[in-house]
Amino acid sequence: METIAFRMRLHPGKRDEYRRRHDAIWPELADALRAAGISDYWIFLDEDTHHLFAVLKRPIGHRIAQLAETDVMRRWWAYMADLMATGPDGRPVEKSLEPMFHLE
């Protein structure tokens, strides 16, 4: 099992709507994330910079890359596109973060 982190960017003024949509995450999306191997998934907001920091665990042999090919993931990205920075394909712009410290 490995832990990864990445950063995304929320548009200013979209905090409450972002939280509302995630509080009502579609069950089929949650199932797809779990089926891809994602667990212990957290997203934090830095309100000063509008950066979202995501941290999750995934096993060796995870299927996260295949999520982009699923209908539910594409629909979620389209649903969230008005709230955050996205690429030409509609997926959120993500920046991988380097681990600097870990205390177990």
Curated annotation (Swiss-Prot):
Pfam family name, one: rhaM
This protein's UniProt keywords: Carbohydrate metabolism, Cytoplasm, Isomerase, Rhamnose metabolism
GO cellular component: cytoplasm
Cross-referenced InterPro entries: Dimeric_a/b-barrel, L-rhamnose_mutarotase, Rham/fucose_mutarotase
Pathway: Carbohydrate metabolism; L-rhamnose metabolism
Residues annotated for substrate binding in this entry: Y18, Y41, W76, W77
EC number: 5.1.3.32
Subunit structure, as described in the record: Homodimer.
Its biological purpose: Involved in the anomeric conversion of L-rhamnose.
Name under which the protein is recorded: L-rhamnose mutarotase
Organism ancestry: Bacteria, Pseudomonadati, Pseudomonadota, Betaproteobacteria, Burkholderiales
